[in-house]
Amino acid sequence: DKKVIKLGIGDVTLPLAPVVVEAMKKGAEDLAHKETFKGYPDYEGYEFLRQAISDYYKSFGVAVAADEIFVSDGAKSDCGNIGDIFSKDNVVLVTDPVYPVYVDSNIMAGRKIVYAASNEANGFAALPDENVKADIIYLCSPNNPTGSAYNAEQLKAWVDYALKNDAIILYDSAYE
C-alpha cells in the first residue's frame, strides 16, 4: 500500500499569522460602523490597499505605483478574464502538475495546451524545451501544488525562451 498524495491544488498548512487575524478583526469591526463602513471597492481594488502593496514593494527597492496595481477576488476569475485579451489560436504552455485553473480556463476558451513535465529528475522545476513553441506560458513559483520554487537562473531560462519565441509569461508568485 502506498500513500496517495493529492496534487490537484496546493493547500495551506499553517494557521494565519497573528497580524492577519488582527487586520481581519479590525476590518470586520470597521464594517460594523457607519463612519468606517466601506462598500464594494472600485474595480481595481481599494486605494488604501493598493497603496499599501506599493509601499511593501518599495521596501524591497521595487517601484510600482499604486495605480499600476490591481487587486482582485482571486486567480480563478483573473485567469478567465486575462485570457480574453489573447487570441484563441495561441498555444499555451503549462508545467505539469499545475494549478488546474490555468488549464481549465484555456481549454474552455478553445486554446491548445502543451505541457512541460515537472518531475523528480528536474527537481519538479520544468524548464523550456526549445523544440516546443508556445505563445503564452503560465509559471507558478512556488508551484501549486508541489511547492517547488524556481531559482533566478531557471527563471532567466524561461524569460530567454519567451523572448526568443515572442511569448508572454503569466507569472503567479503563489504563497508569498
Residue ranges of model-derived segments:
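PLP-dependent aminotransferase-like
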Residues: D84-S141
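Residue-level signal for alpha-helix termini/capping positions
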Residues: E29, D84-S87, L163
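Active-site phosphate-binding strand-loop segment of PLP-dependent enzymes
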Residues: S118-E176
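N-terminal small-domain helix-loop-helix segment of the aminotransferase-like
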Residues: D1-D73, N81
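Active-site-proximal loop/turn and secondary-structure-junction residues that shape catalytic pockets
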Residues: D11-T13, V98, N143, Y175
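Residue-level detector of anion-binding/catalytic polar loops
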Residues: K3, K112, I168
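Generic structural signal for small/hydrophobic residues in well-ordered secondary structure
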Residues: L7, M24, I53, I69, ...
